[in-house]
Regions:
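Post-cleavage N-terminal segment of exported redox proteins
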Residues: 2-3, 7-30, 117-142, 226, ...
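Solvent-exposed helix-loop boundary motif
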Residues: 25-159, 163, 175-180, 190-196, ...
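Extracellular/periplasmic catalytic domains that process cell-envelope and extracellular macromolecules
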Residues: 52-53, 77-82, 92, 123-126, ...
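Extracellular glycan-associated modules
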Residues: 113, 396, 400-656, 822
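Primarily short, surface-exposed interaction patches in extracytoplasmic proteins
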Residues: 144-180, 184-219, 233-279, 341, ...
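Active-site histidine-acidic residue metal-binding/catalytic motifs
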Residues: 240, 261, 289-433, 572-573, ...
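Short, amphipathic C-terminal "tail helix"
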Residues: 984-1016
Length: 1016
């Protein structure tokens, strides 16, 4: 806890609730502010938008329905409360007549009844829901205290305070202020030097300079990205039972850079929702679309893929609705929304925008599931650019030799008919070549344990075959049992099959040629696999012609690599022993292209080909390749080899790049149906993409696809997006949004504490180029933000949640910042922007409890000390320390920040190796940087954590604690050694161990202070 004494006050939230309601405003009653919340909470469940649950056909969510003649009476008769059935029912004495009915458990208190009665008396004026009315910039309100406001925000806040007979608090001291804004904008506390520089800067713009420096820091993007990752449900695993690892961190890098570069929020929106559909879309714009691939993906066997295709599209749509619209339209999946004007048809029309993605219902258990793309880092892209320049030079050198090549090739071919016999075959990537074999159906040829291939390897199998029976194995690698793990190129009923199997049918690929091949005839077959883990990545050629394929099984999720030997003519069980002959069986460690497959299918020698007056394209290619590789002069051979080597190096480089799952439209639009009760297998009415009917229409003149939806999101006519986003920005700095229910701007959501301020900020944001940094700078530059957070008892009693903003924000730090601050204070923090996720300290054995028993292998070295933003996030076992401090679980979209206080948090700070190690490294800083005396060193450590010097009694407490701990560790040097061994970082052996341990214990005390883990 804070070393300063705070009296614990039991507070009642009722006074503030009263302030928010009609009693805080002069008459007349306002429908949106005062009446709609009552009707929504107590009446809409039976008399709202959902016809399925509506009683006696009475609607109270519609003005027309509310005023309609119900057979000689009306629910509401404007101006006449006594004639209104609504008022009669809510005041009825008889339980059988009273509304809400007693059995519902819903009640109206006396004040709410009087509000409804007063509203009817005043004419029952109806309003469209406030959030559905486009925001207009309100005039700045007049205020009495004209000296206090520093920008327009303050005018709105002060006007409300003055109406309540309240005054704002004084400005926080500079040490508090710089710590507050540093934690808010960067997630890292200021250094003592930064604090002192700010305190001693007499310039009138000293604070603004601090704000500008933090806004331009690379730390800013990391701080802002943390909350966006919560909203986007980012994780490093797929979720569900298997919860295998995926690779999405390049999207996280994109988010960080977008914030750091101050990408306008409209572009930020469009690129994430539809960057792939932008004309000439760039790699980065496609990476941005990973926002909508961050949802969970089920790789379990036995699932119904169609069911999960629906779940994924629903997740995308509902996440989009929460993040940009502050909408609970997800409640309309099975029926019309019970509170808001969203129909089930609205739901599925929005759903349709996300139902045309070329993904699959069953995700790969490990790795990324298509569609995905290479996503090189800037450093990797620089390597690729350099490689492309080298390749371009090599291509030019080769092309410059073209005339000489053609002349030399012609001379060589003309001489071949009279030359000694010569032949050539594709050799690049060749693993093995097996000569001619004859099989009688009783045995196979064991080729031994040649190179093994797995599902992330490309490979090819080539062979001349002369089959005598329609079924038989050509080349296999696996146990001599049908459908066991491994590779199998076989014939079955005359058709060629390639099988890649870990476990049949659960983890396997099987493709088959549509047509059978003839028996008792020599023919050449090639089967290739491209490492995609998809059946579409397989090709089969017969005599150089690509064969039409039928996909029989496309469910490969795990690696089929096996140590079993390669077998020629068998290996799939006795029923697949080959009968006939084979020759020139070749195995390649890469995917052969169509041209290479064609050349391998030419059995004639080079001499024979050269003797022909006319040659096929494949025959001409075989002559040309043979010449360039083996018979041209040295300069030509070198140019040819250099070009091919660089092409191969480029392929390997691209294959080494990280990938990211992205959005990609299907070429043919998938039909979308309204699903009865939300069930995937109960399609109803066919629907087309559209936005909810209650909202403005999508602009005409462009395809009605995700790009149209994305642009509609940031269209000035959209009443929600700008409000929703600035409200979440406000939550970042004040802990609570102007609308507390940041995820719900509907009827069940909260009325804004400052509606005019919300609208002013929304309009300012959208009309100033959607400038994220500018709107956030305005917030932190305001006098409202800069107030002290200390609250007198009367203010605490009147406004316990600080919704009226008569004081500055004070709240526990976010989970990431608690840890990052400890790393920064201790000097352990490794600041590297972007990159793969890391695995810092975590209690042993947590992952083993999960299905599959995978163990958590923590990192070593610098990776242990990266910012928490980069911590590996396993959905079924999130980082436990982060969860203790209320981090979002990342299973679904979370936009409201949660804060609790539990004993587990204190236990975490006192015992987790992260904080023990930080304490001892902080102690080293205290001894090496803090001065010569214990008092100076302890004051330095205190300032590292709190940005201020300890006060009199605080210094005494720190010194007493240090002396006590020093006595203990001088007596028990083993305990000192044990403490100083916590964590991987080395301890400074030059420092006295007992003294260092004593300082480390006090450092732990400081890191546990309420003031340390609180922004105030």
């Amino acid at each position: 806890m804070d070393l300063r004494y705070h009296e614990i006050i039991a507070v009642n939230v009722a006074p503030f609730l009263y302030l928010l309601a009609a009693g805080a405003y002069a008459a007349p009653v306002e429908f949106n502010r005062d009446i709609r919340p009552i009707l929504s909470d107590r009446c809409f469940i039976c008399h709202g938008p959902d016809a399925g649950t509506r009683k006696i056909k009475l609607r109270l969510d519609s003005e027309a329905a509310m005023l309609a003649d119900l057979g000689g009476h009306k629910a509401v008769t404007p101006g006449d409360a006594e004639a209104s059935e609504l008022v009669k029912r809510i005041t009825a004495d008889k339980p059988a007549l009273r509304m809400p009915p007693p059995y519902s458990g819903l009640k109206l208190n006396a004040r709410e009844i009087e509000l409804l009665r007063q509203w009817v008396r005043e004419g029952a004026k109806w309003q469209k829901h406030w959030s559905l009315i486009p925001p207009a910039r309100p005039d700045l309100p007049a205020v009495q205290n004209k000296q206090w406001p520093l920008n327009p925000i303050d005018r709105f806040v002060l006007a409300r305070l003055e109406r309540e007979g309240m005054q704002p608090s004084k400005e926080a001291d500079r040490a508090t202020l710089i710590r507050r804004v540093s934690l808010d904008l960067t997630g890292i506390p200021p250094t003592p030097a930064e604090v002192d520089a700010f305190i001693n800067d007499p310039a009138s713009d000293a604070y603004e300079k601090v704000v500008d420096r933090f806004l331009t820091s690379h730390r800013y993007g990391e701080r802002m990205a943390a909350r966006w990752l919560d909203a986007a449900r980012y994780a490093d695993t797929n979720g569900y039972q298997s919860d295998g690892e995926r690779m999405m961190w390049r999207w996280r890098d994109w988010v960080i850079q977008a914030f750091n570069k101050n990408k306008p929020f409209d572009e930020f929106t469009v690129e994430q929702l539809a960057g792939d559909l932008l004309p000439g879309s760039t790699t980065n714009q496609k990476i941005a679309t990973a926002f909508n691939r961050n949802h969970r993906g089920n790789g379990e066997g036995g699932i119904v893929p169609e069911e999960y295709m629906v779940e994924y599209a629903a997740d995308r749509m509902e996440t989009m609705s929460t993040v940009w619209l502050g909408s609970t339209i997800g409640c309309a999946r099975c029926h019309n929304h019970k509170y808001d004007p969203f129909t089930q048809k609205d739901y599925y029309q929005l759903f349709a925008y996300f139902n045309n993605i070329a993904d699959r219902g069953r995700y790969f258990k490990y790795g990324n599931t298509p569609p995905f793309m290479p996503a090189p880092t800037p450093e990797e892209q620089a390597k690729l650019d350099a490689m492309d320049r080298k390749l371009s030079d090599a291509e030019k050198r080769y092309q410059d030799l073209d005339a000489r090549i053609e002349s030399s090739l012609r001379d060589w071919v003309n001489a071949l008919p009279n030359a000694k016999p010569a032949d050539w075959a594709v050799s690049r990537g060749l693993v093995a070549a097996i000569p001619q074999q004859t099989f009688d159906g009783s045995k196979y040829y064991d080729a031994g344990k040649l190179r093994a291939f797995g599902y992330l390897d490309s490979f090819s199998i080539s062979a001349w075959i002369n089959p005598a029976a329609p079924t038989g194995a050509i080349v296999t690698k696996g146990k001599d049992v049908a459908e066991e793990a491994g590779i199998g190129l076989v014939m079955q009923n005359g058709k060629l099959q390639l099988n890649l199997v870990l476990r049949w049918l659960d983890d396997s690929l099987r493709v088959e040629t549509r047509d059978a091949i003839p028996l008792n005839k020599w023919q050449h077959v090639v089967a290739t696999y491209d490492s995609s883990r998809l059946a579409s990545g397989i090709r089969i050629y017969v005599d150089g012609r690509e064969m039409p394929l039928k996909i029989l099984v496309d469910e490969l999720n795990q690696d089929f690599r096996t140590a079993e030997p390669w077998r020629i003519g068998g290996g799939f069980g006795k029923d697949f022993l080959f009968r006939g002959s084979m020759d020139e069986v070749r195995i390649y460690g890469r995917k052969l292209n169509a041209e290479e497959a064609g050349m391998l299918g030419i059995r004639d020698s080079l001499n024979q080909l050269a003797s022909r007056p006319a040659r096929s394209k494949a025959e001409q290619s075989k002559l040309r390749f043979a010449f360039l590789e083996e018979h041209a002069d040295a300069e030509i051979r070198q140019a040819w080899k250099e070009r091919n080597d660089l092409r191969e190096q480029r392929e390997r480089l691209i294959a080494s790049f990280p990938t990211v799952m992205v959005m990609e439209e299907m070429p043919k639009v998938r039909d979308t149906f309204l699903l009865v009760r939300g069930a995937y297998d109960k399609p109803g009415e066919r629907v087309t993409p559209n936005v909810p009917a209650v909202l403005p229409r999508v602009a005409d003149g462009m395809p009605n696809n995700r790009l149209a939806l994305a642009r509609w999101m940031v269209d000035p006519a959209n009443p929600l997006t700008s409000r929703v986003i600035v409200n979440r920005f406000w939550q970042t700095y004040f802990g609570t949004g102007l609308v507390k229910t940041v995820e719900d701007f509907g009827s069940q959501g909260e009325w804004p504490s400052h509606p005019d301020l919300l609208d002013w900020l929304a309009v300012q944001f959208s009309t100033s180029g959607w400038d994220v940094k500018a709107i956030q700078k305005m917030i932190v530059m305001s006098a409202t933000y800069r107030q002290t957070s200390r609250a007198a008892p009367d203010l605490q009693q009147k406004d316990p949640e600080n919704r009226l903003l008569a004081r500055g924000p004070r709240m526990r730090l976010p989970a990431e910042t608690v840890r990052d601050q400890a790393l920064a204070i201790s000097g352990l923090l490794v600041e590297r922007t972007g990159g793969p996720s890391v695995k810092p300290y975590q209690p042993a054995g947590l992952w083993k409890e999960l299905t599959g028993g995978a163990d958590y292998e923590r990192d070593k070295g610098p990776a242990l000390y990266r910012r928490s933003l980069y911590t590996f996030w396993k959905r079924t076992s999130p980082p436990p320390a982060m969860m203790n401090f209320d981090a979002a679980g990342r299973e679904t979209c979370i936009v409201r920040e949660n804060r609790t206080n539990t004993p587990l948090q204190a236990l975490n700070l006192m015992n987790d190796v992260t904080y023990l190690e930080a304490s001892r490294k902080m102690a080293e800083r205290m001894m090496l940087e803090g001065g010569a005396t214990p008092a100076d060193r302890l004051a330095y450590g205190f300032k590292l954590a709190t940005s201020r010097n300890p006060r009199g009694k605080e210094t005494e407490v720190l010194l007493d604690s240090f002396r006590h701990q020093l006595d203990l560790y001088q007596t028990d040097r083993g305990a000192a050694a044990k403490l100083l061994s916590q964590g991987d970082s080395p301890s400074d052996s030059k420092l006295n161990a007992s003294e260092l341990a004593a300082y480390a214990t006090v450092a732990s005390l400081i890191l546990n202070l309420d003031e340390t883990i609180t922004k105030q």
